[in-house]
A protein has these predicted regions:
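Extended active-site neighborhood of metal-dependent phosphoesterases/phosphodiesterases
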Residues: 1-61, 80-93, 101-138
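Active-site segments of SGNH/GDSL-like serine hydrolases
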Residues: 60-70
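Short, solvent-exposed aromatic-acidic interface loops
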Residues: 65, 138-142
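Histidine-centered divalent metal-coordination motifs
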Residues: 67, 97-100
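Short, solvent-exposed loop/turn segments at secondary-structure junctions
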Residues: 72-74
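Sequence context surrounding c-type heme c attachment/ligation sites in exported
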Residues: 77
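A generic structural motif
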Residues: 95-98, 142
Length: 142
């Protein structure tokens, strides 16, 4: 149909966005490179770079959220992406969902964890608790 991005923007807004809650910056990114014809950068490194300094005095921890994880078929420039991600203060973890299964993986063997969530038809989701000295997560099945 070719209207996926238009529908997404109409319902949710920008495909890249961030917010800060409790001193944690959540950077939410479009990583579905195969959905585009290379007319725009996916992931958008200029956007990621701006997030490093934008409102920098308001956060000391960072979480990245995306659909496709680095090194999967949908993701471009994985190693460059990881270099950017590692620059952020107090990087906690990254969340992904493209594979529709629960997973926990240190994709680059550098200590940065990527947690995959299931699809709703499999009736589970992840809950993260970010603490002063780290974080916990649990799988909730319903």
């Amino acid at each position: 149909l070719g209207t996926g991005e238009d529908a997404f923007r109409q319902i949710f807004g920008d495909t890249n966005f961030s917010f800060i809650a409790g001193g944690v910056k959540f950077v939410c990114l479009n990583t579905n490179a195969m959905e585009y014809d290379y007319s725009e950068p996916i992931p958008d490194f200029d956007y990621i770079e701006r997030q490093l300094t934008e409102r920098a005095d308001e956060f000391n921890k960072t979480v990245f959220c995306m659909h496709a994880r680095p090194l999967c078929d949908q993701f471009n420039m994985a190693k460059v992406f990881q270099m950017y991600v590692r620059q952020f203060p107090g990087l906690q973890f990254c969340t992904v969902a493209h594979e529709h299964r629960i997973s926990a993986s240190d994709v680059f063997d550098d200590g940065v964890m990527y947690y995959g969530s299931n699809c709703m038809k499999n009736r589970s989701y992840l809950v993260f608790t970010i603490k002063p000295d780290g974080y916990d997560y649990e799988v909730v099945e319903f």
